[in-house]
């Protein structure tokens, strides 16, 4: 039986490419929601800035029934993803969470696109010069 999941490629200690398959099972979504008192979408977005939530989501996403992942802890995966350049900031962490959400059936393609646009706007704003960002803010407040 095929199980939908999100694949990311990392390199192991020997330098060989390994595919890691991520999916957050429904039971894990429910358990994490109760643990952190958040609905699933809020949990995913909170993972951008909360290391405990991020690691918990990754650990649960690694260990779904039928997976063949060599890595089994979120901590190991975070280090591997940093080394690969997959995650380097809060925005890249949210993007990874969005992909896991799509593969796990709780974020639609349309919702993912909307979230990506929001993330891009945040990223664009963060890379602006302070004067340019302030001018944009003033223009937005006028409208």
Where would I find each of the regions flagged by the language model?
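Charged interaction scaffolds used for protein-protein
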Residues: 1-11, 34, 39-43, 68-143
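Short N-terminal mixed-charge amphipathic segments
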Residues: 1-57
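Short, hydrophobic/amphipathic alpha-helical patches that form generic packing surfaces
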Residues: 53-64, 95-102
């Amino acid at each position: 039986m095929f199980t939908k999941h999100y694949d990311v490629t990392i390199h192991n200690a020997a330098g060989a490419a390994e595919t890691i398959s991520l999916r957050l099972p429904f039971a894990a979504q429910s358990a994490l929601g109760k643990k952190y008192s958040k609905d699933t979408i809020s949990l995913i977005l909170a993972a951008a800035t909360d290391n405990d939530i991020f690691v918990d989501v990754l650990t649960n996403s690694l260990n779904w029934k039928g997976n063949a992942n060599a890595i089994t802890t979120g901590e190991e995966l975070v280090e591997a993803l940093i080394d690969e350049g997959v995650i380097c900031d809060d925005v890249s962490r949210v993007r990874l969470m969005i992909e896991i959400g799509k593969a796990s059936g709780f974020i639609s393609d349309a919702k993912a696109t909307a979230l990506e646009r929001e993330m891009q706007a945040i990223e664009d704003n963060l890379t602006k010069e302070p004067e340019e960002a302030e001018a944009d803010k003033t223009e937005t407040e006028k409208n």
